[in-house]
């Protein structure tokens, strides 16, 4: 990588599936040299996701692992484990979503690694934080959606417990992990020493949910029930127009009054249910019904033009297919095309955020399993004979 704010930072990434790879992809997108350490079987996401041209290179894996290099090590073998420890001794950051007791058994606890690398930032992404009864239990996204209350919010909104059809707890926790790694790197600049970070999925998502839905139970004793009634309303969704759907968000008084004018209901500006933000919140369901009825009068494009002129927040309802061809995303070059060395032409996204002080971050393809094993071993100072022996004994693999 070059030109990003994390240029010069080396990250050893011992993570799999989504939560960890999202964290390390974020660091890689902004310039870090991320070395993905994989077992001989490879990251589970290589094969568990549908959609691929070749085995072990699913579309999801390609999306979550761009801008990284891959080294394939069997750390059950001493030589493979020694390579991993040597890699970590050269790193600024080590990030893993292996459960802590497994890391400790392998001699990969923070206390073990900090002896050789006291400046190491050691990030452990776990399901549940230390000190609680769930610590060391395995966790995946639906487990955390269930226990954190995410599924319960959908139950209250739709009438049945459901998961958000995205791995949102993985995405959210992965992004938070990248964020706190940045905080730790900043502190290291001031102190000169590293530290261990624990990033628990459950606690982070419990914070996410309760920030919105603890509401009246913030007070002791509670002054009302949990839940944001506006967000849990069955009308909190895209609403139908004459020919499709649209989402409108008239929250301020100016926006709400402009919306009432647009739908031909100016009298609602003085209706005591809707004349200020507090009253609109208290009468959220009635406010949604007004919007629902008003929006049926015109087409989506007609409404978008009217709302743009009146500065009322509104946007079209996009299908996933629409997103892939959204004119705004095309204008900002969000999607690009890449010739992958083994997968051929693929569509890819770019990092969403930009920095005025940095150059354009170079983009490299998601690696095949063990694609960079030999070159990384060479960087670590291993001789050709040593590398050959590691490959022959299966301690290191060139992959495929």
Spans of model-derived segments:
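Short, surface-exposed loop/helix-turn segments at secondary-structure junctions
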Residues: 47-50, 215-226, 326-340
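N-terminal helix-loop segment corresponding to the beta1-alpha1 unit
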Residues: 1-190, 368, 374-400
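Glycine-rich beta-alpha junction loops
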Residues: 41, 127-129, 201-206, 243-245, ...
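Oxidoreductase and adenylate-handling cofactor-binding alpha/beta cores
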Residues: 174-194, 207-218, 260-267
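Aromatic-enriched alpha-helical interface/lid elements that frame and gate functional surfaces
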Residues: 234-310, 314
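Short, well-structured beta-strand/strand-turn elements
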Residues: 34, 308-322, 383-388
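Terminal low-complexity tails and localization/encapsulation signals of metabolic enzymes
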Residues: 1-10, 234, 240-241, 322-400
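Conserved Rossmann-fold dehydrogenase catalytic segment
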Residues: 130, 158-168, 189-205, 224-231, ...
